[in-house]
């Protein structure tokens, strides 16, 4: 990937932008392919892009993406417990506060990787749940609120090059998201859950908070896959309109 897919992956990776024009605005930095300290330039460009997530970018027709809205996420865990959770009307806040580091770019293979660190991410949604966790059978629905602290994740974008109307574009093929570490989690299921005729209510929130690392193992695989696919979708929208030479001039 052209090292300076910076602004582009700024528009694809952390950016997650839906672009309505084929030209990048002046406020987005670009890094020439053969420039010295290329990766530092890319890192600075990506960090700048992250700061645009909350307000969006009018010149690109980009709506605000922090908070990030997701219609639905389905958890079907059968590894250690049998637990099904459906999250609806998901609202994710905190991406714009992420710090970007460890950026690497491979020009020959069209790949980009970076590490993002967010001090906190707020996850809010409606939910319904059925199954078993820590020997407790639960069924219920309502609203939930999770606060994840000190989230560190690695993002890896892989693309191929295609020719479109005399321009070379990226066609993203894979966007891998891996949460490397999670410092803390505060988990609140606001409405009562039931075990038979017994109401768990806040007791279930206490149970998952006392065992939050265990509960995170239930959420993590699906969260990584779902958000990785979502980011890939945004990356495809960006790169099918913005030529590589616009984001990484020769």
Protein language model regions, located:
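Cleavable N-terminal signal peptides of Sec/SRP-targeted secreted and luminal proteins
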Residues: 3-22
């Amino acid at each position: 990937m052209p090292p300076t897919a910076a602004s582009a992956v700024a528009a694809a990776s952390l950016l997650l932008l839906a672009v309505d024009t084929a030209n990048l605005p002046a406020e987005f930095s670009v890094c020439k392919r053969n420039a010295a300290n290329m990766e530092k330039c890319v890192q600075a460009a990506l960090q700048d892009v992250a700061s645009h997530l909350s307000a969006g970018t009018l010149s690109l027709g980009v709506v605000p993406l922090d908070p990030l809205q997701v219609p639905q996420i389905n958890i079907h865990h059968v590894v250690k417990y049998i637990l099904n959770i459906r999250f609806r009307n998901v609202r994710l806040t905190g991406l714009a506060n992420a710090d970007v580091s460890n950026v690497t770019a491979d020009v020959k293979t069209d790949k980009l990787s970076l590490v993002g660190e967010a001090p906190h991410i707020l996850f809010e949604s409606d939910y319904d749940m059925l199954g078993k966790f820590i020997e407790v059978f639960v069924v219920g629905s309502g609203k939930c609120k999770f606060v994840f602290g000190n989230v560190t994740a690695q993002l890896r974008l892989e693309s191929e090059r295609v020719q479109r109307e005399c321009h070379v574009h990226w066609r993203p093929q894979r966007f891998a998201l891996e949460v490397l570490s999670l410092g803390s989690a505060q988990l609140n299921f606001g409405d009562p859950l039931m075990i038979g005729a017994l109401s768990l209510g806040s007791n279930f929130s206490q149970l998952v908070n006392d065992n939050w690392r265990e509960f995170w193992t239930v959420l993590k695989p699906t969260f990584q896959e779902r958000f990785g696919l979502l980011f890939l979708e945004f990356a495809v929208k960006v790169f099918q309109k913005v030529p590589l030479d616009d984001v990484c001039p020769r």
